[in-house]
Curated annotation (Swiss-Prot):
Family: Belongs to the GrpE family.
Annotated source species: Rhodopseudomonas palustris (strain HaA2)
Gene coding for it: grpE
Name the record gives this protein: Protein GrpE
Stretches the record annotates as Disordered: 1-36
A Pfam entry, by short name: GrpE
InterPro entries in the cross-refs: GrpE, GrpE_coiled_coil, GrpE_head
GO cellular component: cytoplasm
């Protein structure tokens, strides 16, 4: 025996469902954040920003240090080689100094040619050093400065202020802004005291 009401009941159910109004579910607000949650998020964001800024600063410092190291390597990388070359320049100068002025004046053609050859070699050597950032300096007449000169002895000379370089035993050399070799000098003793440094034109005497 079949149920003759089955299809009819289904149609009625569908019609009833279509006729029923659609009721939307009410929106439920989320729970309020716990006390201090916003402050914690703000603090975390500030810490992350601070960490990022520190990292960027460290990277910039590293870049600058690297640039300086590369520049210093280019400028001062020849220091050891230059010191060895200076010994050759010194020997050439000693050879020239060993020939008195009178002997040069009266020298025959062969000796004059030899002297000129030594002088030319010394000049070429100094020029090669200068091309590589090494320059010669002669502090004659300057006030003694221990940063650039080494005093070998004192010379009684009242005609110049005490502490003045009056003799240069060996010239000094600079490489970049550094002293490659200090000048060996003789310093005046017993002369007048050096004049005080000017103070913007103001007389400070009592």
């Amino acid at each position: 025996m079949t149920d003759s009401n089955g299809p009819k009941d289904n149609n009625q159910d569908q019609a009833q469902a279509a006729a029923d109004p659609v009721v939307s579910k009410p929106y439920i607000m989320p729970d309020d954040p716990e006390d201090g949650a916003n402050e914690a998020l703000i603090k975390e964001a500030a810490e992350a920003r601070d960490k990022m800024l520190r990292t960027l600063a460290e990277m910039e410092n590293l870049r600058r240090r690297t640039q300086k190291e590369v520049a210093d390597a280019r400028t001062y990388g020849v220091s050891a080689f230059a010191r060895d070359v200076l010994e050759i320049a010194d020997n050439l100068q000693r050879a020239l100094d060993a020939v008195p002025a009178e002997a040069r004046a009266n020298a025959d053609a062969g000796l004059k040619g030899l002297i000129e050859g030594v002088e030319l070699t010394e000049r070429s050597l100094i020029n090669a050093l200068e091309k590589n950032g090494v320059r010669k300096f002669d502090p004659s007449g300057e006030k003694f400065d221990p940063n650039f000169q080494q005093a070998m002895y004192e010379v009684p000379d009242p005609s110049v202020p005490a502490g003045t370089v009056v003799q240069v035993v060996q010239a000094g050399f600079m490489i970049g802004e550094r002293v490659l070799r200090p000048a060996l000098v003789g310093v005046a003793k017993g002369g007048a005291k050096p004049a005080p440094a000017a103070t913007n034109g103001t007389d400070t005497t009592a």
